[in-house]
């Protein structure tokens, strides 16, 4: 499994069943198993542990995630900043996760809940494959994640929303050039497939989508899709204080994953840094001698 599962707490690993608890042959959903036997391990229980009486601004929130599809694959990228109200909580949070062999998810919203949700989702996919002997279809993965988002609705209504952006490579699609697919969700768990080739979520999503609208082409390759994803995050950070741009001094750059016929994998840091530096240098040259 991907490295993202290595950071899942032991109590959430699909291979760990507490003594005396029977899974039940008809339960192929690890989330439903937790709901029945260990509800305190569900992401929405995290909201109760945080205390819903606390102001949402007192809890770290993650922003902004973008996805870009290209013939034969899809790129998912996210900035690194998490905020608490007007404060920067952290500059290097991880918001992009490999969830199984052919999917990846990015998170926006209440960081603690969102991270636990996507980790549990990864375990859910592994658990299903172990029991059924086959992986879930991409549409099945989308339905499972939508159900998990819906389960957090109560906390979302209290200001603790957690919203993912899911990308995947659909090995069952008839057209190989259309197998990279993008799905977004609202806080009530409704799913939306994005057919325009790109999507963004989080506080900087309006600015990121405006950037992608100008940069996107249907004939992109992997490298150019990564470049415009990073540039969209750069543009979002330019106007949204909750989105972190490339930090040249600290060498903190966005994180990204690519999902294609070869599977899901993280984009190496060197490629992302090179893309970010190229954007910064080009923008600096464009503004040279102009207004500051």
Curated annotation (Swiss-Prot):
Which enzyme class? hydrolase
EC annotation from Swiss-Prot or TrEMBL: 3.4.25.1
Q: Which residues form the active site?
A: 63 (nucleophile)
Its keywords, alphabetically, are: Autocatalytic cleavage, Cytoplasm, Hydrolase, Protease, Proteasome, Threonine protease, Zymogen
Does the keyword Hydrolase belong to this entry?
A: yes
- Places the protein is found: Cytoplasm
Please name the GO terms that the record assigns under molecular function. threonine-type endopeptidase activity
How activity is controlled: the entry says: The formation of the proteasomal ATPase ARC-20S proteasome complex, likely via the docking of the C-termini of ARC into the intersubunit pockets in the alpha-rings, may trigger opening of the gate for substrate entry. Interconversion between the open-gate and close-gate conformations leads to a dynamic regulation of the 20S proteasome proteolysis activity.
Listed pathway(s): Protein degradation; proteasomal Pup-dependent pathway
User: Assembly state and interactors?
Assistant: The 20S proteasome core is composed of 14 alpha and 14 beta subunits that assemble into four stacked heptameric rings, resulting in a barrel-shaped structure. The two inner rings, each composed of seven catalytic beta subunits, are sandwiched by two outer rings, each composed of seven alpha subunits. The catalytic chamber with the active sites is on the inside of the barrel. Has a gated structure, the ends of the cylinder being occluded by the N-termini of the alpha-subunits. Is capped by the proteasome-associated ATPase, ARC.
Could you tell me what this protein does?
Component of the proteasome core, a large protease complex with broad specificity involved in protein degradation.
Q: Which protein is depicted?
A: Proteasome subunit beta
- What broad taxonomic lineage does this protein's source fall under? Bacteria, Bacillati, Actinomycetota, Actinomycetes, Mycobacteriales
């Amino acid at each position: 499994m991907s490295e993202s599962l290595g950071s899942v707490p032991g109590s959430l690993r699909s291979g760990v069943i507490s003594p005396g608890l029977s899974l039940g042959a008809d339960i192929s959903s690890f989330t439903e198993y937790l709901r029945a036997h260990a509800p305190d391990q569900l992401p929405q229980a995290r909201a109760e542990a945080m205390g819903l009486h606390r102001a949402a601004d007192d809890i770290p929130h993650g922003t902004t995630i973008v996805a870009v599809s290209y013939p034969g694959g899809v790129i998912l990228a996210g900035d690194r900043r998490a905020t608490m109200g007007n404060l920067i909580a952290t500059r290097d949070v991880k918001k992009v996760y490999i969830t199984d062999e052919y999917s990846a998810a990015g998170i926006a919203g209440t960081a603690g809940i969102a991270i636990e949700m996507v980790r549990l989702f990864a375990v859910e996919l592994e658990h299903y494959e172990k029991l059924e002997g086959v992986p879930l279809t991409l549409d099945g993965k989308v339905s499972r994640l939508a159900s998990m988002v819906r389960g957090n609705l109560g906390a979302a209504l209290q200001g603790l929303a957690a919203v993912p952006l899911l990308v995947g490579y659909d090995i069952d699609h008839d057209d190989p050039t259309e197998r990279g697919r993008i799905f977004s969700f609202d806080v009530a768990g409704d799913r939306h497939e994005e057919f325009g080739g790109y999507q963004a979520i989080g506080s900087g999503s309006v600015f990121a989508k405006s950037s992608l609208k100008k940069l996107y082409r249907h004939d992109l390759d992997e490298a150019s899709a990564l470049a415009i994803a990073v540039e969209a995050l750069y543009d979002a950070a330019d106007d949204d204080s909750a989105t972190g741009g490339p930090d040249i001094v600290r060498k903190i750059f966005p994180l990204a994953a690519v999902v294609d016929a070869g599977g899901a994998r993280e984009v190496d840091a060197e490629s992302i840094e090179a893309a970010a530096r190229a954007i910064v240098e080009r923008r600096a040259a464009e503004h040279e001698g102009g207004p500051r």
